[in-house]
Amino acid sequence: MREEMIEKKYEEMGISKEVYRFGKKIEDELKERFAAIDATAEYNQMKVIDAMQKNRVSAECFAMSNGYGYNDLGRDTLEKVYASCFHGEDALVRPQITCGTHALALALMSNLRPGDELLSPVGKPYDTLEEVIGIRPSKGSLAEYGITYRQVDLLSDGSFDYENIKKAINEKTYLVTIQRSKGYQTRPTLSVERIGELISFIKSIKPDVICMVDNCYGEFVEEREPLDVGADMIVGSLIKNPGGGLAPIGGYIVGKKECVENAAYRLTSPGLGKEVGASLNVISSFYQGLFQAPVVTAGALKGAIFAANIYERLGFAVVPNGTESRHDIIQAVTLNSPEGLIAFCKGIQAAAPVDSYVTPEPWAMPGYDSDVIMAAGAFVQGSSIELSADGPLREPYAVYFQGGLTWYHAKLGILMSLQKLYEQKLVNEDMMC
């Protein structure tokens, strides 16, 4: 009776019986996998609670501050919690950091000086970082300040090109940036273990080089984080995993004290650093979001695995595949046509609690070199821990799906995306057998 009620409710929301029953079959096959995700979430939940208890979080920490923000107890305690949770010496966690790209730019520009060289040993960075670095000319880029950039691509099988990485490291190499997630690429996301192996290799050649990890989309997916395996600095956004869907803005930098201090002086000004920067009225959402982040991340991870198994079964190329271990919440699905990419995103939008009536269309989004389509009926604009999908309108027409504040919402989004493809005859009933 209960299962019939659930199926009927999905049907009322536009999911056909064929699509729902196909999804139910896939879901039933994933029970053991989902149990393992829940175990990781439980460990990470204890890790967050432990960090909060050790740093004596109190109700006073949730008070609003304004003006200069001197002696902001909530802000200062939260940064201690982040440092404890991610195993860093210090942390900078601020609403004044507007997004992940801003956090990364802040970390790079504060720790590099003219004449230094930045090395990416994992290939091309995320599109928005190309202008930060100066790969694509932009005002205020690293290149404008005389900071050079060198890149070593991954090998065709996704492994590190150790030979050319060794050749690329020279006396000017000051900072190495390692992007954990795939971005708009179909390369594998890096596990914490693989990141550790790469850092060990790099530091065996040049021990004093700073190794920074772009940790976006990866927090709480595994039991360990990059600082546990030798990274000097990790950087991310609070409207992704660690904000738990509640943080309305913000970014973080955690790691070696000197690296974090440099970032703080760049964010505010020399002589002020971490001492200023009011937390306004968002500080309680930062705490509460971090508290529930492990469980929210687990729901998003289940959604990604569900999507991989559904679309792989239908014959589409997916990265990671349905059985691979997971190291971030992003799922790439290659839909092979602009029609497929647009239909998928329309399905995600139609499943949203906010702006479900809106039809997403491709547009020239700032920071990207091709039109991008985005679906995100979110409570927080741009939040990618909430159910969202996006992709550039260029071959191979891959969509990047992520998020879902609950597993059930992620499930609805995937089924709705499939429904849209089904209605446009881009998949058929025979494929869902």
Residue ranges and their predicted role:
Residues 66-74:
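N-terminal small-domain helix-loop-helix segment of the aminotransferase-like
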Residues 2-27, 31, 38, 48-54, ...:
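Conserved PLP-enzyme active-site core in the AAT-like
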Residues 61, 65-66, 92-95, 329-334:
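Short glycine-rich or small-residue beta-strand-to-loop segments that form or flank ligand, phosphate
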Residues 312-432:
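Conserved C-terminal alpha-helix-loop-beta "cap" of PLP-dependent enzymes
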Residues 85-88:
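Flexible linker/loop signature enriched in Pro/Ser/Thr and Pro/Gly
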